[in-house]
UniProtKB/Swiss-Prot annotation:
Family, as annotated: Belongs to the TRAFAC class YlqF/YawG GTPase family. RsgA subfamily.
GTP-binding keyword on record: yes
Swiss-Prot/TrEMBL cofactor(s): Zn(2+)
Subcellular location per the Swiss-Prot or TrEMBL entry: Cytoplasm
Protein name: Small ribosomal subunit biogenesis GTPase RsgA
E.C. numbers: 3.6.1.-
Domain of life where this protein originates: Bacteria
Stored Pfam families: RsgA_GTPase
Self-association state and partner proteins as the record states: Monomer. Associates with 30S ribosomal subunit, binds 16S rRNA.
Signal peptide limits: none
Residue ranges constituting the CP-type G domain according to the UniProt record: 77-236
Keywords noted in UniProt: Cytoplasm, GTP-binding, Hydrolase, Metal-binding, Nucleotide-binding, Ribosome biogenesis, RNA-binding, rRNA-binding, Zinc
Species per Swiss-Prot/TrEMBL record: Onion yellows phytoplasma (strain OY-M)
Length: 306
């Protein structure tokens, strides 16, 4: 059997790239898929026969009766359920500064979920041309707080401003483009790979948000690596979090825990002598960052009541 990387799934056909010959083939899944040591994100009652092959999977395949059949999947180092992508090296998290308007709440929620998944994040802020210079400067000052945790880029995809500075991060990596619908992920991908077959749409004036332009996850080769364009994220679920351990997914909080009177058991809420709250008062923690933490804590706590 030969080994290949899954690039795309469309209408029952898997597009795979042979890792030795580099040839792209059309393949189908065998009736009963072999999935040794695969940790699935599907429901517990899922079986090998209905196991979902994800974009990014490394698979074994063979030719049978003039049809290439995927026989088995190699163990994944990580995976996402929505979108269905496996073996991710990093996430390129794209936010627009306007249209749709930027929200610190949404940024913090994305970072929280990706931190739980133990995925490296690169932050990209698009549509810088649509802000007045003074407003852009103000936004950059506020966003600079996040630079101590993630690589950081400002871009204008349509005019290709900042695109060249971004290219090196894709080398030898499988990179997932993530972000709210309409922030310019497909436009960014088109700026990086002009011949990629993509459709971009204008923002809905009535809703102030984007329409879906990507329906299925797909791997595109670029600069020695692969970029995964995914459907827009319309729902960010916090149901996998526990209120008491939420704080552990805030690296900027963790570095101040040593100053908490209650140490690692401190929730950074009502406790006295809290190192995180002291750092907040001293301007070392962004106020919106802490406020969003409290909001997420209450949201998760309320979910447990039902």
């Amino acid at each position: 059997m030969e080994k290949a990387l899954v690039l795309r799934f469309l209408a029952g056909v898997y597009y795979i790239k042979d890792l030795e010959t580099q040839i792209i083939l059309e393949a189908k899944k065998r009736g009963k898929l072999k999935t040794p040591d695969i940790k699935t994100t599907q429901k517990e009652n899922s079986s090998a026969s209905d196991f979902i092959i994800k974009v990014g999977d490394i698979v074994f395949y063979e030719l049978s009766c003039d049809t290439y059949l995927i026989q088995s999947i190699l163990p994944r180092k990580n995976e996402l359920k929505r979108p269905n992508v496996a073996n991710i090296d990093q996430v390129l998290l794209v936010f627009s500064l306007v249209k749709p308007n930027f929200q610190f709440l949404l940024l913090d929620k994305f970072l929280l979920i990706l931190e739980q998944q133990k995925l490296d994040v690169v932050l990209v802020f698009s549509k810088i041309d649509l802000l007045e210079p003074e407003n852009l400067t103000t936004m950059q000052q506020q966003l600079s707080y996040y630079q101590k945790f993630q690589p950081f880029y400002y871009i204008n995809s349509k005019q290709k401003i900042g695109i060249d500075a971004l290219k090196h991060i894709f080398a030898n990596q499988i990179t997932v483009l993530a972000g709210q619908t309409g922030v310019g992920k497909s436009t960014l991908l088109k700026a990086l790979i002009p011949d990629a077959k993509l459709k971009t749409q204008e923002i809905s004036e009535s809703l102030g948000r984007g329409k879906h332009t990507t329906k299925n996850a797909q791997l595109y080769e670029f600069n020695g690596g692969f970029i995964v364009d995914t459907p827009g994220f319309s729902k960010l679920d916090l149901t996998t979090f526990c209120p008491r351990t939420l704080k552990n997914f805030y690296p900027d909080f963790v570095e101040h825990v040593c100053d908490c009177f209650f140490g690692e058991s401190c929730l950074h809420l009502q406790e006295e002598k809290c190192g995180v709250k002291k750092s907040l008062e001293n301007g070392k923690i962004l106020p919106s960052r802490y406020q969003n933490y409290v909001s997420f804590y209450e949201e998760i706590k309320n979910q447990l009541k039902y």
